[in-house]
Amino acid sequence: MSNWYSKTKDQTLIDLETNEQHGLTEEIASERLKQYGSNELATKQKRTLWQRIFAQINDVLVYVLIIAALISAFVGEWADASIIALVVVLNAVIGVVQESKAEQALEALKKMATPKAIVKRDGELKEIPSEHVVPGDIVMLDAGRYIPCDLRLIETANLKVEESALTGESVPVDKDAIYHPSMQSDEQVPLGDQKNMAFMSTLVTYGRGVGVAVETGMNSQIGKIATLLHEADDDMTPLQKSLAQVGKYLGFVAVAICIVMFLIGFLQRRDTLEMFMTAISLAVAAIPEGLPAIVSIVLAIGVQRMIKQNVIIRKLPAVEALGSVTIICSDKTGTLTQNKMTVTHFYSDNTYDQLENLNVNNDVQRLLLENMVLCNDASYNNESQTGDPTEIALLVAGSTFNMQKDYLEKIHERINELPFDSDRKMMSTVHTYDESYYSMTKGAIDKLLPRCTHILKNGKIEVLTEADKNQILEAARAMSREALRVLSFAFKQYNSSNVDIDHLEENLIFIGLVGMIDPPRTEVKDSITECKKAGIRTVMITGDHKDTAFAIAKELGIAEDICEIMIGTELDNISDTELASKIDHLHVFARVSPEHKVKIVKALRAKGNIVSMTGDGVNDAPSLKQADVGVAMGITGTDVAKGAADVVLTDDNFSSIVKAVEEGRNIYRNIKKSILFLLSCNFGEIITLFLAILLGWATPLRPIHILWVNLITDTLPALSLGVDPEDPDVMKEKPRHAKESLFSGSVPFLIFNGVVIGLLTLIAFIAGAKFYTGDTNLFPLFPERIDEDALLHAQTMAFVVLSFSQLVHSFNLRSRTKSIFSIGIFTNKYLVFSLLIGVLMQVCIISIPPLANIFGVHALTLRDWGFVLLLSIIPLVVNEIIKLAKKN
């Protein structure tokens, strides 16, 4: 990439073979579009369909299921093989579909705004889509327009560009088209100092300019950052790690159990084919086949709920990660604040007050308002606004007193002007006022006040005394103490329109001051208080000045003392170790660069925190990637920031992050309920089969029974638990520890309930055989002593009790401490519906002959059904007794 800033205008035009007057021809532009490609940021290469499918099946659990399906098919159990294969295919389809939806959402975000560019081609100005701009195009710039590519400026008129998307600096930068010989050195000049360059995705806030396109698409400065992002890998979230660990563990357990059971069967001299099927039964029992799909579906439902809270989840695991966040690092502008400068105070005619108390009937204060509106190059109405944010704030203030710029300029026509420049820090305009002429001047108080010789007080022009100056400066200091940006205003009267522009800003008459600030969002303070209750720390990170940052932070309750702030220069001079030792006591970082943000996030994560980071600019992308949860702004955010983030806020509001955290906590809690339910049920199945084989009994459950229970009977309650109503106290709890296991404190519960379900199933198996044969021997269960019909009846009883007891057990998962009767059985209508559907389907399997043949089950008597129902409610009764005992 050439250092275009170090070349003269003529040399740049020669190198790019273009012409300032005529631009490129359409023919050459078309050729260059083919040569350089479209002027847009490339997305990460999409995975092929086969790559996506392989990613979904590349898992230990899935491999065990595939082997089980192959063995089932080999021994002629086609029903079992088909069901297992269906499970594998369904899981893969759900995963692939979910990934495709995420990609579609990304594409939609990219297309939300397709900016246009005005270029000169064949000597004519044409508006074209920005992606069609090519190197050598002559591009026109004016206020309010986004810059379509990297430009070497060749003509400017008071051009200001807001480069925060690239550099992080929110104050617009003055641009020129001048060749700077000092930039000829070998050292790379920082982007912020390349005054004769304008960069892709930055915004013109003032003036106009002409530039020649030098770099487009991925060759632009923003493209370079996008390239780095594509090379970065994403870390796994705690839930992903836990599920991956569970998957591997269960896979190995399934294989180990199969081997052990096969050896036991061999020692017991059992039939080889029977042991194959028993081993498959155990493998299937050990694996919660519906788990991946259930987790994905619950997360997807959570995503839909979050959309209603103005939160778009780009990556499903971010839902869970949000729930474990311990620190929210938030940008100030637009997220904690309203992102619009607002005039809040004024000083005029010896009066210092809030703007709402300004008196338009007071001649001095009215002239202050007129100056604010007339000495102004911005435009504003209810539908749109263009120009510098400070000037827009002045117009908004005027409009609240019914002073519209269009109307005032008709009465007081502008006849001359002296534009703002960064050296004078002032701007002046000349207007007609009845039979005379007024020059209106606004600017920084340190530049304007020394040029004032008089003051307008009580409707009269008086000499400006030292006492007056002291009073003015004290008013300015009062505004500064409240972190307000201070602007001063003056005027001068003329009898003729022949005004000497060189002396326009001399011997001025002081009118007044205004103080403005980007005020906090009204709802944010309550959200930060809620975060504190939830054990979440809010850290403000901003490029703004220390005093402004502290004023906002104090008002919002983020910081209480100035010692809780660190500025960028201090971060430069502190080691990572020192920062880590201090970071727990720092709540605000001011005047920071993108590199500082990454350093802060690293330090916070090194202390074991789960960090959420907000950002909107390209420069924020590295820190968004570095954080556990990157949150991009949907309104002001760049495509690169959105691409780097896990979450996008459609309203750019801090309160939406807090709502997302609450939703994330509830979703994680519900997913945990679903997983514990599935695993306790699977453990019950393993207990049933393991004990039966160990005792030398016939197999109490067939593979198809276990598959049915795992895929259908268990899946509906697991999904229903995944959408359990929100816990109103969830934001009163501290965040869970980053290393906390998914099963923390839950293993005894899981094992106990698994044993209960397993033993109840075995009791049903014993009773089924006894009821059918009438054998007085307690255990007529050895394969050689039980006939086929009796075994069928016993397996049917075991199958029904296993299914029903698991359905009832699902109600235990709603709360481990509160009784289901105090929560309310019907407060989760989906769970009640799942229970009814599960019972109905089970009855159909037993009662409808074709289904009974497929599942290998036997009709039950009224006595059988009564016994089954009695056994099935025991898990609920036992858990309610335990809860009551703990409570007392």
UniProtKB/Swiss-Prot annotation:
Pfam families, per database record: Cation_ATPase, Cation_ATPase_C, Cation_ATPase_N, E1-E2_ATPase
Listed SUPFAM superfamilies: Calcium ATPase, transduction domain A, Calcium ATPase, transmembrane domain M, HAD-like, Metal cation-transporting ATPase, ATP-binding domain N
Notes on how activity is controlled: Inhibited by cyclopiazonic acid (CPA).
Catalytically driven reaction(s): Ca(2+)(in) + ATP + H2O = Ca(2+)(out) + ADP + phosphate + H(+)
Compartment annotation: Cell membrane
A Gene Ontology term for the protein's cellular component: plasma membrane
Keywords associated with the record: ATP-binding, Calcium, Calcium transport, Cell membrane, Ion transport, Membrane, Metal-binding, Nucleotide-binding, Phosphoprotein, Translocase, Transmembrane, Transmembrane helix, Transport
Catalytic residues (positions): 331
Entry membrane topology: Multi-pass membrane protein
Broadest EC class assigned to this enzyme: translocase
Gene3D superfamilies: Calcium-transporting ATPase, cytoplasmic domain N, Calcium-transporting ATPase, cytoplasmic transduction domain A, Calcium-transporting ATPase, transmembrane domain, HAD superfamily/HAD-like
Transmembrane segments annotated in the record for this chain: 53-75, 79-97, 246-266, 283-303, 675-695, 703-723, 747-767, 791-811, 831-851, 865-885
Superkingdom of origin organism: Bacteria
Major site of localization recorded for this protein: membrane
Assigned protein family: Belongs to the cation transport ATPase (P-type) (TC 3.A.3) family. Type IIA subfamily.
Function: Catalyzes the hydrolysis of ATP coupled with the transport of calcium.
Name of this protein: Calcium-transporting ATPase 1
Organism: Bacillus cereus (strain ATCC 10987 / NRS 248)
